Amino acid sequence: MIFRKLRKFLKSKLARYPAAFRIYEAISWTFTRSAFSPKHFFPTMAAILFPTWIAPRARLALHYVGEGKLDRAIAIAEDVLARKPEAYLDDDTFNRLAVAYHLEGRTEDLRQLYDNTEDRRSEIARELQYDRLALRFFPRAGFSSIGPLGLLDIYLKAQILGITPPRTNVILGARKEFANPAYLRYWEKYFSLVSHPPTIALLAPLSCYLEERSNQLWCGPRGMRNVAMIGRAAQLQWEAEGRGPLLELSNEHRERGYRLLREFGVPQDAWFVGLHVREASDRLNLRNADVGTYRLAVEEIAKRGGWVLRMGDDSMRPLPPWPNMIDYVHSGKREDWMDVFLWAEGRFFIGTGSGPQMIPPTFGKPVAIANYGPIATIVCGKDDILLPKPYWSKNEGRYLSLSERMQPNYAFNESIRAFAKFDVRVVDNTPDELRELVIEMINRLEGQHAETEEERATQAQFAALAATYQFYPVKIARVFMSKYPQSSQRHMASTFQESLLQHN
């Protein structure tokens, strides 16, 4: 952090001296991005001289992932696992190897990595009798981002419903280390927070064997289960029993939120929605979209008297003036509690396959989910609507059906690079499709949406598909069903069904 600030300071001062600035840039490139940079050079030498030294080799694999050299990253991951397949991998090492497999679309290898690691952790926990303590830890390393924080909803619902064993749930880390400290406070009603660094360090020998991951849940004798699978079971049962949301916006945040809306110019009686569009990230880039394509959707909301507040962070590109649109992330007034207010108090939320999409349902608010890729990973509820990205098969000259998207090559894949290997092009939703999604959400909320017989039949087919592959049967947007008919009932290879059922 100190060196980063120093570099930023020097860069600003040297900008007025072109010759000195070019020398600085050359030195900076050499020591930060070239093959001689410490982050690259030392792990590379360690990989050559000490091939059994796992930690630096895993760091090198992650470095290759960042450069888009996934083949090299995968080669390191496979060699590490081949040399020590029985070894317990710490979280950092595990995550570095897992990212490489995930981006390459190696779903089965990723699942095997999860299974082997969790089996080993469970074995050690039993040997040391840690499992008898009935504790469950949620470390900052795995749950600091906003999406994993939203998944606490699923973890808790599953425990309340008896799907997972009863545990005392402990979050490890200082509030300021999490993406949204104000949102974290809402969960402290149900979770204990340990924030004192020495205490966290003392707990480390215990907690490392009892930690949860943000995409796998421990279900007792049944072993590990994918969070989307547990999310389906928990949410369907929760809804069937008529239970309400776990979180409720505080009066203080509600009052402060509406006060700030007035400062933004939102009329007192106007309704509003939050909008978040993921952008500018190379990893998991299938989740990205162009916020500029949402203009027609925003105009539709404005036409109906609503306002839109664009959420995210100030690294996102600013928006031009749109009717009834507030570029909240560039307003200079962004606060963690205001983010919570927008998620919890908006009429609905417009999201993509990114973390903020997870939060409104924890307060009982619906989400219009657009530009979504791997449907098998969806975690949502009965009031949400999904507009997936279409998958175009170059070999067959047509769009893949929803059932075909459950095949191993596509089901959990979030890397456009990996799709290119299968000659499949992932297509972003069009401005017209995004507008139709918003219209459908508003009409549903106002009780003015009437499904056709064909839509009901298609939705029933999709629900059956979701039951087979154990993910939530979210409502598919009308515009997707009409524009990309899902009438063909192609089935998956029996080998994939068997492997999926064994995993379950």
Placement of each model-derived feature along the sequence:
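Leloir-type glycosyltransferase catalytic cores
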Residues: Q216-E263, K382-N504
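Secretory-pathway glycan-assembly enzymes, especially type II membrane glycosyltransferases
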Residues: L103, L110, D119-E252, F462-N504
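A donor-sugar binding/catalytic signature common to diverse glycosyltransferases
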Residues: D339-I385
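Structural register within alpha-helical repeat arrays
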Residues: A26-I27, L60, L97
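Catalytic donor nucleotide-activated moiety binding site of glycosyltransferases and closely related
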Residues: A270-W271, L275-S281, V291-D336, E454-A460
